[in-house]
Design a protein with these regions (language model features):
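Hydrophobic core positions of alpha-helical segments in small-molecule transporters
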Residues: 5, 41, 55, 81-86, ...
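Hydrophobic transmembrane alpha-helices
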Residues: 5-12, 38-49, 98-105, 115-117, ...
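Hydrophobic transmembrane alpha-helices of multi-pass small-molecule transporters
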Residues: 50, 91, 149-153
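C-terminal transmembrane helix and the adjacent membrane-cytosol boundary/short C-terminal tail
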Residues: 56-67, 71, 75-83, 139-166
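Interhelical loop and adjacent transmembrane-helix boundary motif
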Residues: 105, 111-154, 161-164
Length: 166
């Protein structure tokens, strides 16, 4: 049920989510409006399904007999999770984190609407330069974004390659 609820944030367009949080934040919680915590909350709502889906897939691949074996050998639930489940699901969790990082880096509507005054990201720098037709100022941030995106893809593909052997 929790997993399905998280998909709502992914289905809603970013601009709709951002405007809803502007309405809620400015009307009911003015002290949180245009703060970093509100922006982070919007990112969590927007991109949590990617992390949950990736992690869920990894967890479903864990053989329950391995977890049972850890428990019968005297490990606590937490110990079994740390020593058995977590190592087996680590690649899926890392892939989910890389995917969320990659999509968060490219998110524009939520960032433009909810960012605190004076808070700049790579995407907002590119947007501002493009909006002013100062394309020469967009080159360096664009190249940085491409480099970060490329490295994130390398991490994702490396994780995928590591899962092929399972």
């Amino acid at each position: 049920l929790f997993e399905r609820v998280t998909y709502v944030g992914f289905a809603v367009p970013g601009i709709v989510l951002a405007l809803a949080l502007v309405y809620f934040g400015s009307g009911y919680l003015p002290w949180i409006y245009q703060t970093l915590p509100l922006l982070v909350f919007a990112y969590v709502v927007r991109f949590l399904p990617q992390a949950v889906g990736s992690s869920r897939t990894s967890i479903l691949q864990v053989d329950p007999r391995l977890v049972e074996a850890g428990r019968t050998l005297g490990e606590s639930s937490l110990g079994t999770f740390k020593r058995v489940t977590l190592p087996l699901t680590r690649s899926g969790i890392v892939a989910g984190a890389a995917l969320v990082f990659l999509t968060t880096m490219k998110e524009l509507p939520v960032t433009l609407i909810l960012r605190p005054s004076g808070f700049e990201t790579i995407v907002t720098q590119i947007w501002r330069a493009q909006e002013s037709a100062l394309y020469q100022y967009a080159v360096v941030p664009t190249l940085i974004l491409l480099l970060i995106s490329g490295l994130s893809m390398v991490v994702l593909l490396a994780q995928e390659g590591g899962q092929e052997g399972l």
